[in-house]
Amino acid sequence: MARLLCFVLLCGIADFTSGLSITTPEQRIEKAKGETAYLPCKFTLSPEDQGPLDIEWLISPSDNQIVDQVIILYSGDKIYDNYYPDLKGRVHFTSNDVKSGDASINVTNLQLSDIGTYQCKVKKAPGVANKKFLLTVLVKPSGTRCFVDGSEEIGNDFKLKCEPKEGSLPLQFEWQKLSDSQTMPTPWLAEMTSPVISVKNASSEYSGTYSCTVQNRVGSDQCMLRLDVVPPSNRAGTIAGAVIGTLLALVLIGAILFCCHRKRREEKYEKEVHHDIREDVPPPKSRTSTARSYIGSNHSSLGSMSPSNMEGYSKTQYNQVPSEDFERAPQSPTLAPAKVAAPNLSRMGAVPVMIPAQSKDGSIV
């Protein structure tokens, strides 16, 4: 009975060890974004495996919306690595001779989209074997900033904050005091591993240099801050100064506006006065006045004559003297007045008057 059991065990071991097998165990791999992930896949062949060697790596993305995709393939002594666009140029076999039993690959410049399940499949008829590896890509903490939220005055309440710009969860925080006794204040001990420390009733003993370290499974980052707890400032003086400054600014603005308004009024007044002043222009000279003077003197002479002697004068016609702006109108020929003897004129009370001669065109000579 014992011999039969040993025979069965030996047969099982022989069957288990025969044929193609992948010796690398399945495992979970965690790497940081931007790093290189090494996915191992080592295999052994048996004499019975006589067919062509085919090696392929497949990926099942973490979103589970895409079926398994081939990312790199070895077949017919050739390598094909352009099947999966997201990993094109970033996946390579680590061995120059994969037939030696090493089908491991490197995935460079890891991105969050590379997260998923990778499968190594080796085929050499009649043997077939495969192993799966879970790749997780994490982001290192970076860009961490330490700052004080509040007024750093004695008796005040404020907060010390430690905030990384990026980093995959879970994140761990640790505060330390780097100056003086390097001992954290007792009220803060409960929050030494928190991203925020709440400071109550601050005292000058809290002043010093502090550091905050944040880390996750793939990396860490650190920031520092200087805390200076000072006596309260003179708020009344500050408020009074602000009020006085505001009033002075308002007065200055008012003065500027007043000056601008006054200047505009002066300019407007000067402009109106300038438009109201007109220079008197003398009227154009006319020859009509000369003619009128002659006619007036002639009428005076005729007024001293008797009605019987004015018969010749009543028929005399004078044409109107045109202005310089118009052409002179043609004149009708004038009749010579009747002659009266000098003794008759004297008896009539006439006074001798010199009458200027008149040309045919009406002008006085």
From Swiss-Prot:
Keywords in alphabetical order: Cell adhesion, Cell junction, Cell membrane, Disulfide bond, Glycoprotein, Immunoglobulin domain, Lipoprotein, Membrane, Palmitate, Phosphoprotein, Receptor, Repeat, Secreted, Signal, Tight junction, Transmembrane, Transmembrane helix
Pfam families from the UniProt entry: Ig_2, V-set
Residue ranges of domain Ig-like C2-type in the record: 20-136, 141-228
Record topological domains on the Cytoplasmic side: 259-365
Disulfide bonds: 41-120, 146-223, 162-212
Domain of life: Eukaryota
Region feature Disordered, mapped onto this chain: 269-315
Lipid group attachment sites (S-palmitoyl cysteine): 259-260
Biased composition (Basic and acidic residues): 269-282
SMART domains: IG (SM00409), IGc2 (SM00408), IGv (SM00406)
PANTHER family linked to this entry: COXSACKIEVIRUS AND ADENOVIRUS RECEPTOR, COXSACKIEVIRUS AND ADENOVIRUS RECEPTOR-RELATED
Protein's name according to its UniProt entry: Coxsackievirus and adenovirus receptor homolog
